[in-house]
Amino acid sequence: MSNRSFKNFIEEELGTFPQFLIYALLEWILIIILFIDGFLAFFSNQIAKFFDLKIPCLLCTRLDHVLVSRNPDFYYNDSICDAHKKNVSSLAYCHVHKKLSEIKRMCEGCLLSFATEKETDVDTYKSLIGILHKDLELLIDDERELQLAFPVAGSKKDENFYQVENRTNNSNDRFQRQQRCSCCGQIMKLKSDKPKSNNQSFFGAPSPSPRVSFNQRTLDLSNIKYTDLPEDDDALNTKGASLDAVDDRTPSFVKGGNKFFGIPLSDSAQNSPRWSVRSMKKSFVDQNGLESEVLDGDSILQHLNRQVRLDRKSLMDLYMELDEERSASAVAANNAMAMITRLQAEKAAVQMEALQYQRMMDEQAEYDQEALQSMNGLLVKREEEMKELEAGIEVYRLRYGLLREERGEAEEFLDEETKPVSDLPVCSSNHEEDLEQMKDSAEDSIGNNGVMIIEEEKENGSRKDMLVKEISEITERLNAIESKGELLQQISDVLDVSEGEAILLQISQNLHMLRSFIEMPTES
C-alpha cells in the first residue's frame, strides 16, 4: 500500500466501476469545499476593498507552508492550470510601477526595469528582445526613419514596391500610434508625420545640411531603417546609383535621446566607431552584384545596432552603479545620524545624572551646614552664659568681698574643689552623678554662706537686705545652671564622645572655679 497510490489501490482491489463512483464522490466533495473556499476568499476580498485594506495575496494566505512543508514548485506548477500558466508566463514584473503586465506590450522603461536588474550579458538582452519581437523602432522612442533605397529610373517593379511599402507603413504607423504600454499606459511610439513627395523622397538624394558637418560624429545611428529589395535582374544595375546616394547624403542631427535615462544618444555615440569610417569601406565594395551590397549593409546595421545596445548597456551599468553609490551613501548617512542621536541621548542622560548627583550633594552640604551652624550657635550661647556668670561673680566679689568661714571647713572645701581635672570621671554615663554632687555641694555652700551671712547681718544689720538679694540671685543662677546641665547632657548625646566629654569637662572646671571663687576665704 505504501508503494502504490490510492487510485491504483482502488482500481486493483475494487475494480474500475467502484473507482469511478469513489472518485466522482471525492470530486463532488472537493467542488463543495472549493465553493466554500471561493466564497470565503471573495468575502474577504470584498471586505478588504470596502474598508480600503490591502487585498490578501492568493499564495500568502494559504496554510500549506505552515502545516506541511511544500516544494515551491507545487505552488507555481501543480496548483495552476495550463491556461493560467500561459497567461502568467506572458507577464513581467515592472520594478518601477510594481505591477505585472504583458511583456509584449511594455515600454522601454518598464522593460529595462526587469531586463537589466540582474542580467548583465549583452547576448542575453539581445535574445530577450528577439523573443519579445521588439524591433529597433520600439526600443528607441525618439527615432526617425532614414531609408537606404537602391532605385533605378524607369523601373516599374520598384514603383509598385514603393507603393505597397507606403501602404504597409501607413497602416503600421496608425497601429503604433494607438499602441500603449500595458504597465504605465504611455504611448510606446509617437512618429511624426513626414510629407513625402512623388519621386524625390524615394529616388532623389537630399542636399547636405550646412549646419552639421560630416566629421562632427553626431549621427543618430539608431534612426536607420533598412528596406529589403527583391533580387532580380533590374536590381543588379542599382549599385552605382545607390552608393552615390548614400555617400552624398549628410545625416541629420536629431535632438532628444533616451527618454528613460534622460541622456541624448549623441553623447553615447561619441565613444563608438563612426559612420565616416564605415563609409570608406563602402567605396571598396566588390563589383560582384547587389547580393554583396545587401550583406554589407546588413552587417553595418547589425554592427550599429550592436554598438547602440552596448552604449545603452554601459549607460545602464553606470546608472546602476550610481544608484548603488547613492544607496550606500544614504545608508552611511542614516547610520551616522543614528550614531549621533544615540550619542546625544547618552550625553543627555549623563548630564541629567550629573545634575541629580550635584543637587543631592548640594542638599547634603546645606543640611550639614545648618547642623554646624546650630551647634555653633549653641556653643556661643553657652559661652555667653558662662561669661555672664563670671561677670556677675566678679561684680559680687567687688561689691561684697569674699565670705569668711572657719579655717577647717575652708581647707576641706579647697582640698575637695582644687582636685586636678584629670581626676574627674570621663565616662559620659557619670556626668549626671557629677552634676548631682556639684548641686549638693553648691546647696551646702549656699546654706553655709547663708548662715554666715545671717551671722554677719546680726553684726552688720545695715547690709542685710543687700545680702538677701544677692543670695536669691545666686540661688536662681544655680537653678539655671542645673537646668542647663540637663541640656548639656542632651548635647553630649548628640555630639561625638570626644567633643561632648571635652565640653562637659570644661563646664565642670568652670563650675568648680565658680564655686571656689564664691567660697574662697580671704587670706589677707
From Swiss-Prot:
It is found in: Membrane. Residues 299-397 form the GTD-binding domain. Its main location: membrane. It comes from the Eukaryota. The chain crosses the membrane at residues 20-40. InterPro entries: GTD-bd, MYOB. Residues 462-490 form a coiled coil. It is a single-pass membrane protein. Keywords: Coiled coil, Membrane, Transmembrane, Transmembrane helix. GO terms for cellular component: membrane. Probable membrane-anchored myosin receptors. This is Probable myosin-binding protein 5. It comes from Arabidopsis thaliana.
